[in-house]
Amino acid sequence: MKPFSPELLVLSFILLVLSCAIRPAKGRWILWVIIVALNTYLTMTTTGDSTLDYDIANNLFVITLTATDYILLTDVQRELQFRNQKGVEQASLLERIKWATWLVQSRRGVGWNWEPKIFVHRFSPKTSRLSFLLQQLVTGARHYLICDLVSLYSRSPVAFAEPLASRPLIWRCADIAAWLLFTTNQVSILLTALSLMQVLSGYSEPQDWVPVFGRWRDAYTVRRFWGRSWHQLVRRCLSSPGKYLSTKVLGLKPGSNPALYVQLYAAFFLSGVLHAIGDFKVHEDWYKAGTMEFFCVQAVIIQMEDGVLWVGRKLGIKETWYWRALGHLWTVAWFVYSCPNWLGATISGRGKASMALESSLVLGLYRGEWHPPRVAQ
């Protein structure tokens, strides 16, 4: 593969911003073609680091999906508003570029008129920058400590010692939990750092930031796990094509069950493609990880889950704490059963070294190993 060009990635992002900043015009689709061409080329390049290649490939497809939404499917300047801001198409070019940059960056829609009604923890508009700084520093330190503790497990000989699908149940659960904890807290560290930079620079306000992951106690169904507890960084770009397909192409009534299930299956299909592209970069094989199967079956199980819950409501069963507890057990059991092939291939491709920090506060305080030896892939 040819070497990766970060300049072309930056160019792709700039073109996406410009496509949202220019006033509505029929020729905007040309920018979409250029963005898709750039991203397709970059997907066939490599940095030499499999973990970085995986992340870059995923983000390239996210940019492509976002460009499809904002250029082809949505009249962004007329349909999307930030905090009731109106008339952006009449604003100056500089103001439209600022607006478009914030739109492209706002993957979760916080503060926009398309924000999902699921975010329960957010900063008050009255929160000072100093208070935000202190709270986010504590939050970031907590996330780092959890990653550090998971690193201790990743460095042990029992961690990820064999393919995940063939592991004894207890070690399979331990490996999945380690991956889940490390991944969620690592992503949270990155978003916390980004929030600090933007708020302290005056680019954004404390109220523009919410935790990247929802409450785990809300994940008592598979649907709620994906829709509330898991990150929502790709929610819009995965759902917009399905909404267009269901209402504009198939002519289904918005909000009807047929339309919603078309959107559900389309979103998980695109999620499968997104992750399969990353897996291909690592394994050079579209099928080894079973990525498409894993993500597409999530839609199937959610529809079955909806049916069971519908029957329960018809029987007069009320939602109580013990039913939620049973739901949590069901959700955990489902992922322990369904994710070993995909997750195992992902971990083996990236190596367990990707879940071992290069520096460790815990080991440093415990035995002076501030920079422990590198873990073998």
Curated annotation (Swiss-Prot):
Pathway(s) the chain acts in: Secondary metabolite biosynthesis; terpenoid biosynthesis
InterPro entries membership:
Wax_synthase, Wax_synthase_dom
| Transmembrane region(s) | 29-49, 56-76, 176-196, 258-278
Q: State where the protein is found.
A: Membrane
Keyword tags: Acyltransferase, Membrane, Signal, Transferase, Transmembrane, Transmembrane helix
| Top enzyme category | transferase
User: Which EC number(s) does UniProt give?
Assistant: 2.3.1.-
Query: What cellular component GO annotations does this protein have?
Result: membrane
Please describe what this protein does. Answer: Acetyltransferase; part of the gene cluster that mediates the biosynthesis of pleuromutilin, a tricyclic diterpene showing antibacterial properties. The geranylgeranyl diphosphate (GGPP) synthase ple4 catalyzes the first step in pleuromutilin biosynthesis. GGPP is then substrate of the premutilin synthase (PS) ple3 to yield premutilin. Premutilin synthase is a bifunctional enzyme composed of the fusion of a class II diterpene cyclase (DTC) and a class I diterpene synthase (DTS), with the corresponding domains and active sites containing characteristic aspartate-rich motifs.
**Family under the similarity heading:** Belongs to the wax synthase family.
Mind telling me what this protein is named?
Acetyltransferase ple2
Native source organism of the sequence: Rhodocybe pseudopiperita (Clitopilus pseudopiperitus)
Taxonomy of the source species: Eukaryota, Fungi, Dikarya, Basidiomycota, Agaricomycotina
> Quick one: which gene encodes this?
ple2
